């Protein structure tokens, strides 16, 4: 028997209701959004009422709504979390993205749970454990390569694997970063990351010699895996996740539309894959991720350690490379290159000291740029466009609603007429009305077809309409309009009542974890989490860093390696011309020692 096509999900971020709607209208199959509390982005919380409105719209198209509760929970918050989860379940949320395993022992409804990347999901053993615990969709660690993803899929074929494809990168393995808590009392595991990794540092050796001065040595480029989607599909990824719950609407529209196009191109060639939702989206611009915020792009270890992934010069957006400065005059700059700027664009460059400088372009005349204020730029400097005025206008105007394609048939009955509608998701409605059947004096078929096709400001658009009788009856336009409106309401009601959510199975008996002890990186912050792990056979459980900070332990665990970025990778035979240990020093004098575990290809950051 032929296998059914694999349903593939494009998962887009949303900081609020409006952004979520924009994501859906630009091609998302699912959206993830923050709850009022307990999400990994404190600045991106939303009311339950807004989430309820979102689910009603999303479910029309089979789009799923995931809510992020991906932080660790304290004991005095458990009752609030239980109450919030019940509210979210009651308004139709499809799943929660969670970090704290204590949630599995809470008194909550059977809402589906997904394992956040904050759980540090990078081994088949970990994924299998979570899957057996009832978390059917697992967000993989960003650092995993194609071969590792393939191996996990083969080992745990039932688990739905979710992987990031685009957006900002955390330098530490997610869930294992304690730098923000240590330095600023703001826990990344509590949704309050202070972005320690985007700071500027000096790199000094054991003798105090400055190796690198004032660089963003932990700041990474942004992920862009758009060229590798097919390989990821074949490795077993079924959910493609865009990072960015703090990003503005234009970013989400642009990146979502771009990945929608790329995936649809693959589906057209590969019928074994299909999108998981329904509806036509028509962005009113040509998507281009290079035109939205980015620090430069990397596929981030997807095919091993090759290209450098760091963005040492700046943690800010570079945008798209446009050309090289050919000449600097008193009040304008001449640029060589095939790309063109426009009035109102933002431009930037890296100066001789390695710092990012920017300026606004007031006027463009051919290859001449007239800045609002002349920057200190020299001949030969590469220019980037980090704000495209024209593109941003196009994206902001793009508001075309999503539509379900609809096939209609209009038939004659014994005592009237019937209108049947079936949309692309398979939802069907039929209405019969009694009506006098008088023959028309003039041909009516063209007018009837036009009346039947007028679905206007509804979620439907007619792509096929058939009038299945030969007689030319006079049918009042008001009757056709009433039938059309009634059938529309019937379709909408069926979408509301027939939508089926996946529900979580009860926690199984006899679930065991191979580890017998867990250190602070397990992030156990409440009694329920401790009880969960104890029930799985764990005997020694350390408290979370946020509760009892252990001394002299790594604050970060990174696959990014500063020695590799600087050309001193010992695994490739290179020698470092400075004495170890190396340390990072921030502007206020605080120091952080670097530990290099070359066998595991990992760099650790430890406070001195």
What kind of region is each of these model predictions?
Residues 43-47:
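An active-site metal/cofactor-coordinating segment within enzyme catalytic domains
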Residues 94:
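Short, conserved active-site loop motifs that form the nucleotide-linked donor/cofactor pocket
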Residues 116-117, 121:
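Ser/Thr-centric signal marking residues that sit
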Residues 1-25, 30-40, 50, 54-55, ...:
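Surface-exposed amphipathic alpha-helical tracts and adjacent flexible/coil segments at the periphery
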Residues 104-109:
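Short active-site loop/helix that positions an aromatic residue
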Residues 122-126:
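Short, glycine/polar-rich helix-capping loops at beta-to-alpha or helix-loop-helix junctions
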């Amino acid at each position: 028997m032929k296998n059914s096509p694999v349903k593939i999900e494009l998962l887009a971020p949303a900081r609020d209701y409006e952004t979520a709607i924009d994501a859906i209208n630009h091609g998302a199959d699912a959206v993830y959004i923050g709850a009022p509390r307990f999400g990994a982005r404190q600045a991106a919380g939303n009311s339950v009422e807004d989430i309820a409105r979102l689910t009603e719209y999303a479910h029309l198209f089979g789009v799923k709504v995931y809510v992020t509760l991906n932080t660790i929970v304290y004991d005095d918050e458990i009752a609030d979390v239980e109450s919030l989860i019940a509210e979210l379940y009651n308004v139709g949320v499809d799943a929660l993205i969670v970090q704290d395993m204590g949630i599995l022992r809470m008194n909550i409804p059977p809402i589906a749970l997904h394992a956040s990347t904050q759980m540090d999901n990078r081994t088949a053993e970990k994924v299998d454990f979570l899957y057996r615990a009832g978390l059917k969709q697992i967000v993989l660690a960003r650092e995993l390569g194609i071969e590792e993803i393939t191996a996990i899929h083969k080992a745990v074929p039932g688990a739905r694997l979710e992987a990031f494809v685009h957006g900002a990168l955390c330098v530490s393995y997610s869930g294992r970063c304690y730098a923000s808590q240590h330095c600023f009392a703001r826990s990344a595991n509590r949704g309050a990351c202070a972005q320690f990794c985007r700071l500027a540092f000096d790199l000094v050796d054991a003798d105090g010699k400055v190796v690198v001065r004032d660089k963003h040595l932990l700041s990474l480029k942004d992920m862009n895996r758009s060229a590798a989607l097919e390989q990821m599909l074949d490795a077993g990824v079924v959910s493609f996740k865009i990072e960015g719950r703090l990003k503005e609407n234009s970013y989400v529209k642009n990146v979502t539309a771009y990945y929608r196009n790329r995936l649809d191109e693959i589906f057209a060639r590969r019928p074994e894959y299909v999108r998981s939702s329904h509806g036509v989206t028509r962005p009113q611009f040509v998507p281009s991720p290079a035109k939205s915020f980015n620090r430069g792009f990397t596929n981030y270890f997807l095919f091993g350690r090759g290209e450098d992934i760091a963005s040492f010069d700046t943690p800010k957006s570079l945008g798209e490379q446009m050309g090289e400065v050919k000449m600097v005059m008193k009040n304008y700059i001449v640029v060589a290159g095939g790309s063109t700027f426009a009035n109102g664009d933002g431009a930037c460059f890296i100066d001789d000291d390695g710092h990012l400088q920017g300026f606004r372009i007031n006027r463009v005349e051919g290859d001449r740029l007239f800045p609002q204020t002349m920057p200190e730029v020299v001949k030969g400097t590469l220019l980037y466009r980090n704000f495209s005025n024209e593109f941003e206008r196009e994206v902001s105007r793009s508001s075309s609603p999503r539509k379900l394609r609809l096939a209609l048939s209009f038939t004659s009955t014994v005592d009237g007429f019937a209108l049947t509608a079936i949309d692309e998701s398979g939802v069907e409605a039929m209405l019969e009305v009694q009506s006098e059947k008088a023959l028309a004096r003039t041909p009516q078929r063209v007018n009837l077809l036009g009346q039947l096709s007028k679905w206007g400001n509804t979620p439907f658009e007619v792509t096929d309409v058939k009038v299945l009788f030969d007689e030319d009856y006079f049918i009042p336009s008001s009757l056709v309009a009433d039938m059309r409106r009634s059938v529309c309401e019937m379709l909408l009601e069926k979408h509301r009542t027939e939508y089926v959510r996946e529900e979580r199975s009860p926690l199984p008996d006899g679930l065991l974890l191979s580890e017998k002890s867990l250190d602070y990186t397990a992030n156990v912050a409440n009694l329920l989490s401790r009880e969960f792990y104890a029930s799985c056979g764990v005997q020694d459980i350390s408290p979370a860093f946020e509760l009892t900070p252990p001394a002299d332990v790594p604050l970060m665990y990174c696959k990014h390696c500063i020695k590799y970025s600087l050309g001193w990778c010992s695994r490739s035979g290179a020698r470092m011309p400075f004495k170890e240990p190396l340390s990072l020093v921030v502007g206020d004098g605080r120091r952080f020692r670097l530990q290099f575990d070359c066998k595991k290809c990992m760099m650790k950051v430890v406070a001195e």
